[in-house]
Amino acid sequence: MLLGTTSAQVVRPGSCPNVDVPIPPLGLCRTTCQTDANCQEGRKCCKNGCGFMTCETARF
């Protein structure tokens, strides 16, 4: 068991796309990230409209 370990919280600039309107790329119904740190540069960990989190291109 590892004690005292933490995951660094990374918050990338920009915002997530709006999921109120169905958008096909957001329809991936599985979790692919937990925080922005799990995503490539320029992408954020966002709600995908299915109740899960996926990496999406940040909106500015």
Swiss-Prot record:
The keyword Signal applies. Expressed by the venom gland. GO terms for molecular function: peptidase inhibitor activity. The keyword Disulfide bond applies. It comes from the Eukaryota. Residues 1-8 form the signal peptide. This is Waprin-Lio1. One of its GO terms (biological process) is venom-mediated disruption of cell wall in another organism. Keywords: Antibiotic, Antimicrobial, Disulfide bond, Secreted, Signal. PROSITE patterns: WAP. Disulfide bonds join C16-C46, C29-C50, C33-C45, C39-C55. Belongs to the venom waprin family. Its main location: secreted. It is found in: Secreted. Damages membranes of susceptible bacteria. Has no hemolytic activity. Not toxic to mice. Does not inhibit the proteinases elastase and cathepsin G. GO terms for cellular component: extracellular region. Residues 9-59 form the WAP domain. It comes from Erythrolamprus poecilogyrus (Water snake).
